[in-house]
Curated annotation (Swiss-Prot):
Keyword Ribosomal protein (UniProt): no
Species in which this protein is naturally found: Azotobacter vinelandii (strain DJ / ATCC BAA-1303)
Similarity-based family: Belongs to the UPF0761 family.
Location in the cell: Cell inner membrane
The protein's name in its UniProt record: UPF0761 membrane protein Avin_36810
Length: 408
């Protein structure tokens, strides 16, 4: 029980260290700046897409009201009137103007994707058609899914089971938790679809729930702060809603990125422990998988390593690929896998150690046991190396710095 508690503390410590190392606050500020220019275009595109479907007429107003009512603190009510005016004016734009709005929205989505790829250590971002199709799907199918969800919720609310004064308590509770469910679904979809890598659905769901709960808590605390400390109203007067809205957007992006870090690091089984496995041992384990696959004429992919007992995070897998490809030990094949392109019978361990960016581990860094056939020989060699090192360099430092003069 105590070990599990210590592991949990280590995990959250590592998570926040990664968040700061990935410049989460700086990325949240950049996304806030980008989103500031994309709020009106995205809301306008939602109206435009929903207006294409006759059954969704008028749902855009419901979506806008729902967003400001449940996802923005009460201080955003004044700003909502301004945005509604801007959106009404933008809805009368020509198709050329709508195209400009769409480009603005696409730029924000590209910024989000770049930030997520940085968190997931993705080496190859989407390019060309695949990137355009993803962003187009979000901008076109997203409003339709929102409209369908709101039409369904409106229908459920109209049922006597919910709207009747004697409605079931469970039905009323469902309506109360709907914002949390919508937030969880939105965050989960964001974490699954945007990074250019395979994200386990259960990890994305846990991260989505974490971000949604944190989002609701932050909304309540933010509203409480605005009510108890009305400093912004005293300084900015009628314009107080603008800096408050910017601050809220910044906090929201911080939560989104922190949830992304959680999703990314849920698969990092070893990285957050205080005594992680030395990276050189991981490299030898990966090379053994490549060597075995070469004997059977098979290419290696990341799931093959997981089946062999090496569940590497994407960042570690990418580091291994970078080094092995740079040393011309592996090469990529047409189907996306990797194969050895060098005869390991003609490549010594000494050559690997001299070129590896990861140092030879000390004995106290080795695990007590490791299910690898090469591990006992490596431990024995390190023990012998340590004894020889102690014999060679065991003399006092004073004698090394000022050796005795040799007799004539």
């Amino acid at each position: 029980m105590r070990q599990r508690f210590v592991d949990s503390l280590d995990f959250w410590r590592y998570l926040f260290e990664r968040f700061l190392a990935d410049q989460g606050p700086k990325s949240a500020a950049a996304l806030t700046y980008t989103a500031l220019f994309a709020v009106v275009p995205i809301m306008t595109l939602i109206f435009v897409v929903l207006s294409v479907v006759p059954d969704f007429q008028g749902i855009g107003e419901q979506i806008q009201g729902f967003i400001f009512r449940n996802f923005v603190p009460s201080s955003g009510a004044v700003l909502q009137d301004y945005l509604r005016t801007f959106i009404e004016q933008a809805r009368h734009l020509t198709w050329l103007g709508v195209g400009v709005l769409m480009v603005t929205a696409l730029l924000m989505l590209m910024t989000v994707e770049h930030t997520f790829n940085t968190i997931w250590r993705v080496r190859r971002p989407r390019r060309g058609l695949s990137s355009f199709l993803l962003h187009w799907a979000i901008l076109s199918l997203g409003p339709l899914l929102l409209g369908t969800g709101f039409a369904l919720s409106t229908y459920i609310t109209s049922l006597s089971l919910v709207s009747d004064p004697y409605a079931l308590a469970g039905a009323r509770m469902l309506l109360k938790v709907m914002p949390l469910l919508f937030s969880t679904a939105a965050f989960t979809l964001l974490y699954v679809a945007v990074p250019n890598t395979a994200v386990p659905l259960r990890h994305a769901l846990l991260g989505g729930l974490f971000a949604a709960v944190l989002f609701e808590a932050a909304k309540g605390l933010f509203g409480l702060y605005v009510a108890l400390f009305p400093t912004y109203q005293l300084i900015y007067g009628a314009f107080a809603a603008v800096p408050l809205f910017l601050l809220w957007m910044y906090l929201s992006w911080m939560i989104v990125l922190l949830g992304a870090e959680l999703v990314c690091n849920l698969s990092a089984s070893r990285r957050w422990r205080r005594n992680p496995l030395p990276r050189l041992l991981v490299l030898l384990g990966v090379l053994r998988v490549f060597h075995q696959s070469q004997q059977s004429g098979q290419a290696v992919r990341q799931p093959d390593l997981q089946r062999a007992g090496w569940a590497l995070p994407d960042s570690v897998w990418d580091e291994m690929l970078d080094f092995l490809e740079r040393e011309q030990l592996i090469c990529r094949v047409s189907d996306g896998g990797w194969v050895l392109c060098r005869d390991l019978n003609r490549y010594s361990l000494e050559s690997l150690l001299s070129r590896s960016p990861w140092p030879l581990p000390h004995l106290d860094q080795l695990p007590e046991s490791l299910d690898e056939p090469w591990f006992p020989a490596l431990r024995s060699a390190l023990e012998r190396l340590q004894r020889e090192r102690a014999a060679l360099f065991g003399d006092s430092l004073a004698n090394w710095l000022q050796p005795p003069l040799s007799e004539p």
